[in-house]
Structure formats: C-alpha cells, structure tokens
C-alpha cells in the first residue's frame, strides 16, 4: 500500500505543487475533501511555523493520518516584512489574489526598495512527532502587475525572480517548483520522511 499523508489545505494550487514534489517518494497526498472532513482551522499564530503547526495538528486530530500543512506568504522589506502571515487575508476578505497583489503594489508606489521574499513553513505531525521545516525564495516586487504570465497564483504576478529576471507568473511550474520557497521547505521534509519508516 502506498504511504499516505494528509495535506492540510483546501487550495488546489498547493495540492498540485506539493503532490508533484513528493511524488518521488511515492507518497499519496490526501486532502481534507478526499478524507471527507471539514477543515478550516483558525490561523492564530504570529509566525508561518506556528500557523503550519496549528493546521497540521488539527488535521491529524481529525484524521489520525500523518499530516502536513504549510503556511506561506510574501514578506516585503519596505513594509517591515508585511503582509507576512496575513498574505492570504491582506486587504480584507473581499479581495481576491489579484486585488491583494494590486494593493501591495499601491502600498509600494514610489518606493525604491522592492526587496521581498516568499517564506514557507511546513509542519509534519503524527502520533509521536511534531516537526517543522522552512524555506525562502528571495526576489523583488515588480512595478506593475503581470498580465502576460499564465502560471502560478497569489502574488506570483508581482514577484520577480532575479536569476530569471521575470515574475513567477511567467515561469513554468517545473522550473518554479525547483526554486520556490515551498520546494526548499519540502526538500527538508523529504529528508526527514526518508528517515521515517
């Protein structure tokens, strides 16, 4: 039987990204929907790591299947690392991904400091273990929203990846998945999972 991990997200883009990266270990990823559980934990942590652990613990409690969850976001130097853990809620619940990205551009208007990084913390929880892994991807915030790119989600249309000098929204998934903050955290998780029976 395939090894199974429950993934604490309802975001299909994250499911796809995590599944493609963990495929090499032959791990079957199960979502809350697959497991028919209602999963909507309150993210009350002040760090990505705390929020990831809240989600992984909740999912393990509901399913009793070894669980992973991530919390990630974008941190902008000129905004004192905001929106940070509030990235998905930045600007309020009425904004979608594009609205949040445009609001971020508005807040940076005229600011020369465009440094930013994507951060990701992934937590693993089972009956005897609580572990977390972190990754970062450094970049810059663009001057305008990219309407050409067809890849990615969230803040990808305004996040410039310096080695390729283009926004994540113009970088194919395989390439992005090899350099992303989530990939770096998942690589650490992979190392850990290889040591677990």
Swiss-Prot record:
Binding site for substrate: 9-14, 72, 153-156, 176, 181-182
Name this protein carries in UniProt: dITP/XTP pyrophosphatase
Catalytic function, reaction form: XTP + H2O = XMP + diphosphate + H(+); dITP + H2O = dIMP + diphosphate + H(+); ITP + H2O = IMP + diphosphate + H(+)
Any one GO molecular-function label of the UniProt entry: metal ion binding
BP-aspect Gene Ontology terms: nucleoside triphosphate catabolic process; nucleotide metabolic process; purine nucleoside triphosphate catabolic process
Cofactor details (free text): Binds 1 Mg(2+) ion per subunit.
Entry's EC annotation: 3.6.1.66
InterPro entries in the cross-refs: dITP/XTP_pyrophosphatase, ITPase-like_fam, RdgB/HAM1
Active site: 71
Keyword Metal-binding: yes
Family label: Belongs to the HAM1 NTPase family.
Quaternary structure and partners: Homodimer.
Cofactor(s) recorded in Swiss-Prot or TrEMBL: Mg(2+)
Keyword terms: Hydrolase, Magnesium, Metal-binding, Nucleotide metabolism, Nucleotide-binding
Function: Pyrophosphatase that catalyzes the hydrolysis of nucleoside triphosphates to their monophosphate derivatives, with a high preference for the non-canonical purine nucleotides XTP (xanthosine triphosphate), dITP (deoxyinosine triphosphate) and ITP. Seems to function as a house-cleaning enzyme that removes non-canonical purine nucleotides from the nucleotide pool, thus preventing their incorporation into DNA/RNA and avoiding chromosomal lesions.
Superkingdom of the organism of origin: Bacteria
Residues that, per the record, bind Mg(2+): 42, 71
Source organism: Leptospira interrogans serogroup Icterohaemorrhagiae serovar Lai (strain 56601)
Cellular compartments per GO CC: cytoplasm; cytosol
Short name of one Pfam family: Ham1p_like
